Amino acid sequence: MILELPKFATVEQVAAIRNGVRPFLPEVKIPTYNRDGKSVFISKTPALQTVDVLVATLMDKLQAEVVQHRYKPMFNSGDSGYEYHLYAPGQICHYHTDGEVAQGVLRYATVILFLTDNEGGELVFPTQNKEVKPEAGKIVVFPPYGTHGHYTKPSKTNREILMTWFVYDGIKVSGVAQ
């Protein structure tokens, strides 16, 4: 199930996230296995605590209003921290699945918050025959499993997103190839 929640974040919240994070973008791209562009891990950047709290408030609302009812997690859960990503024109996120287990924790939902309106840059789920248009403030929630492989199309303008994963609290997975 792929959920689209238009205008979940307000124009003001989106602007606060974008303006808060941009000064912390690295000068050069730090290699990641499936994404072009530049990233900032908000939750691991002490100077971004205000942005981290703002995003946490949005994710708490998402958890309470949507995720708890749609995904019905079996255990206490929370998110895994927040990653901001900037794609320059023509850059993409390559086809991949997010994976159910990462860094020893069990994921059950992927969350993407679009921070810009774009022509192009659609989030594509080929197996589900679904494309999601980037619209500032829209949240997309989907399973991290192999059933929901995805990629993005290139955009003609800068595209900005924020990502997190909902994970089970206190449940550690060991002995699994990651």
Please place each PLM-identified region on the residue numbering.
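A generic fold-level signal
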Residues: A9, N76-D79, Q103-R107, P134, ...
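Non-heme Fe(II) oxygenase catalytic core, chiefly the N-lobe of the double-stranded beta-helix
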Residues: N19, V67-G104
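Catalytic core of Fe(II)/2-oxoglutarate
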Residues: R107, N118-Q178
